[in-house]
């Protein structure tokens, strides 16, 4: 009986802890607005503006087609640059 009560209290505590420490998804877009505004003023601050070199046709691309200039990787080789 005591073990059952301890288990119930532990589950309730862990459930409450999960809700308390979880991110508030309702305000997620509000928190991104100041950052986006800052990135518009300073384009260098945006990580998405960084350009990475892409692989040309015939280059080994692994399984990630996003590394190819054409974004098309078939049998681990970039196609159509």
Swiss-Prot record:
Family, similarity comment: Belongs to the conotoxin O1 superfamily.
MF terms in GO: sodium channel inhibitor activity; toxin activity
Propeptide boundaries: 23-51
Residues spanning the signal sequence: 1-22
Tissues in which the protein is found: Expressed by the venom duct.
GO cellular component, one term: host cell presynaptic membrane
Domain remark from Swiss-Prot or TrEMBL: The presence of a 'disulfide through disulfide knot' structurally defines this protein as a knottin.
Main location: secreted
Cell compartment(s), UniProt: Secreted
Protein name stated in the entry: Delta-conotoxin-like Ac6.3
Family matches, as Pfam families: Conotoxin (PF02950)
Function: Delta-conotoxins bind to site 6 of voltage-gated sodium channels (Nav) and inhibit the inactivation process.
Disulfide cross-links: 54-69, 61-73, 68-78
Keywords: Cleavage on pair of basic residues, Disulfide bond, Ion channel impairing toxin, Knottin, Neurotoxin, Presynaptic neurotoxin, Secreted, Signal, Toxin, Voltage-gated sodium channel impairing toxin
InterPro entries per UniProt: Conotoxin, Conotoxin_d-typ_CS, Conotoxin_omega-typ_CS
Natural source organism: Conus achatinus (Little frog cone)
UniProt entry tagged with the keyword Methyltransferase: no
Methyltransferase as UniProt keyword: no
